[in-house]
Regions:
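Active-site beta-strand termini and strand-to-loop segments that position acidic
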Residues: 126-131, 187
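Active-site rim elements
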Residues: 32-40, 79-87, 172-173
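Aromatic- and carboxylate-lined catalytic core of secreted/periplasmic carbohydrate-active enzymes
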Residues: 8, 72-76, 80-117
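Short hydrophobic/aromatic beta-strand or adjacent loop that forms the aromatic wall/cage
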Residues: 121-123, 133, 179-184
Length: 187
């Protein structure tokens, strides 16, 4: 997957302790390349936003109003007020930000291991770990349903899905992930 090439390139180009800034949009992107809700509309936004919050050696960038369905580009050089009130993505971002804040597995210095979980052209999965704290992230970066199968037996067990707030059994059994789907599990 091209994303791995980009990560590998940053591993080579930057010092080992350098932090990357990941984002789905920002003020400049919104101004020049359309509003966040246009470039990654609806469900398409979520797996990429999950990545920005859970990737190795990273700092996520969330810009003003990203939790709001702001449907137009922001003026760049003039004051442009963002009217808030709907907060369509508020719960989604609250879960991610809370997890990042309280779980040491998402610290900048926590380990990162890519995991095979299905069609690698569409599914990107990885484990972040720091001591006994471990987080499994599975992302469907496609508009098609994907079959998920975890081959790494060390990841099997009853684990907590932070978005459903339920315990799920992860095993060799296959399951389906909806288009643009995502799952984040805490061990």
């Amino acid at each position: 997957m091209d994303f791995d090439s980009a990560l590998n390139r940053t591993d080579k180009d930057f010092p080992a302790n350098a932090l990357r800034m990941f984002f789905t949009s920002n003020h400049d992107e919104n101004t020049w390349n359309k509003a966040d809700y246009e470039t990654t509309p609806g469900a398409k936004h979520a797996p990429f936003a999950v990545m920005t919050q859970t990737m190795k050696r990273s700092i996520p960038l969330i810009y003003s109003g990203q939790e709001e369905p702001f449907l137009r580009a922001i003026r760049f050089f003039d004051k442009d007020t963002i009217t808030l009130g709907n907060y369509q993505r508020e719960n989604f971002y609250s879960v991610l930000l809370h997890l990042r804040k309280v779980n040491p597995a998402l610290a900048a210095n926590a380990s990162f291991k890519k995991v095979t979980a299905g069609n690698e052209d569409a599914v990107y999965a990885y484990v972040r770990q720091n001591g006994k704290n471990k987080v499994l992230v599975i992302l469907n970066w496609s508009d098609k349903e994907q079959t998920i199968k975890i081959a790494d037996k060390t990841l099997y067990g009853n684990i907590h899905n932070v978005f459903t707030n339920n315990t799920q059994n992860v095993s060799a059994k296959e399951w389906k992930m909806k288009p643009w789907g995502y799952a984040v599990y805490v061990y």
